[in-house]
Amino acid sequence: MEPDDEEHIYLIDHAWTYTLDSAKAILNANENLVQRMCSIMNISCSNSSENEVIENILKEMWRYNNSYILQNTNQAGFFTRCWFIMDEFGSRIHHSEEPTFSMVPFFFCGDKMMYSLLFPAVSVTAGEEVTCNYPRLKNTLSEEMKMALKYPWVPSDLSEIDFSQSEPDLDYFMSGRHMEILPEDEYELPSLVHEPKIRLYTDYPEVSEFLTDPRFYSTTEKTKAHILWLFERLYDYKSLAESRGELFYVSQFPSEQVLINKDLLAIVCRRSCEEDEANINTFENCPKWLPTTYSLMIELPQFVSYFQNREKRNLDNVWICKPFNLARGLDIYVTDNLTKIIRLSEARPMVACKYVTDPVLFPKENVGLVKMDLRFIVLLRSIQDFELFVYERFWLRFANKPFSLEDFEDYEKHFTVMNYSDFPLQQMFCHDFIKQFEKVHSPHKWSDIENKIYKMIKDIFIASALREPPAGIGSFPGSRAMYGLDIILEWDRNHNEPQINPVLLEVNWMPDCKRACDYYPEFYDDILSVLFLNEIEGKHVVQL
């Protein structure tokens, strides 16, 4: 067989296609599928209960899994990741660093079915073994990285690898990212304080709907607007300033990806770690409010070592895997399965964050104690003069099922973002929450927890300004930005009396504030007055 021979393209069927949240339920309802998966994966069904067999399949299937994405045509940016296991032939194909064949997913419109195509990668003679490449494996990779990537099929002990973390060089901060082009000439930034009609261009419907302050009015002409409140990224500040002959206000900062991208956020936050705390061998978070986080793209060997060292010490090993730059709960997985984590890293660039296994829970009527997290709105008016504010009113997000360290595929148990799905959504005003929280978790005072949250937020933004772009957030005279910080509360039981500490989950740029507007119709009046008119009094903000 020759690689360019069109006669040697073979179709491989998929034995099972599913989404991760439905896998266990499908197996529980289909005995024939269970038997077939046991046969494909060489799992013995004797001397094991039905539940044990299914759990073995769910663990072992990560040596066989592959995936593809189906885009949601009704909701931009939303998708479904489908996982599949090939038929008996496809699942028997071994991996090799010198593969003889290539394999790719193939969607056939005729029957609306997904298959895999197999075709020779090199000249192959009769009797040679059909092999495919290890995912992500390249000859240029280090031996440690190769061992980590091959782990699902060739398990090895990597615990001797140094799992301490260091800050990558500037190339990493620039890799795959657009750098902003800033004006070189000195342009004037017009003051808006005495401007009777402030022209605002926005592509956010909520801003147009809820902004009632008569000093602001909407315009469709971007080049004539005083303020650009944008959903899309702006990279060429220079050309826009030149076309206007003056500077402008815009709802973003140069290089703010160091806060938004989860891999960079972890790097930035580690700058807040005190020297006497910076000992990763204690297996403590550093800083305490940042979950231990590894980039699975560049730190996979270190992560595997850290995982195996925790395992040897009988420490819990539950992790949450998140894409670098997605939000709204998309493509996020909770697991304690090392093979699964490594295979997830093939799907897209991801981080593995230590899962908060002892969260502060909240009673939900007719349900029980559920997981919750908090969304705080943070306003950055200047990074150079460090003008930072937090909106006093936060909002709550609750899981729908009682929390426990099991059933990690159960979205309603382990996740709280329900407003982009068909799951029930519980809503509560923050002032009502505080009263009930102090009642449930007495003697803990919300004011003490709030002070910790505010200090954490300030530390995050200080850390982001410690380096020049692209390793730190940049400065532009007209930059004003709003960020949504997702925070969870965690028990610290290392004291005589348990303490409650905040833990950062992620930072979102220009967050969805529809719920904030529904709760507080004056929300955008407050936000824009603080950012662009320097008004603080009566605007429900605290300066940090």
Regions found by a protein language model. Name each.
Residues M1-T100:
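Catalytic cores of histone-lysine modification enzymes
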Residues E2-E6, A15-T19, A23-A25, N32, ...:
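Conserved beta-strand elements of beta-rich interaction domains across eukaryotes
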Residues R81, I85, S116, V122, ...:
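Short amphipathic alpha-helical molecular recognition features
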Residues R92, A126-E129, E144, T202, ...:
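Acidic, Ser/Thr-rich intrinsically disordered and amphipathic helical segments
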Residues E97-K197, M510:
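C-terminal SET catalytic tail plus cysteine-rich post-SET Zn-binding segment of SAM-dependent SET-domain
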Residues F108, P190-S191, S239-Y249, E284-K288, ...:
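Surface-exposed beta-strand-to-loop junctions
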Residues Y201-V318, N325-A327, V334-N337, R343:
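Conserved N-proximal alpha/beta basic substrate-recognition cap immediately N-terminal to
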Residues N314-N317, F324-M482, I488-I500, K514-L544:
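Catalytic core of tubulin tyrosine ligase-like
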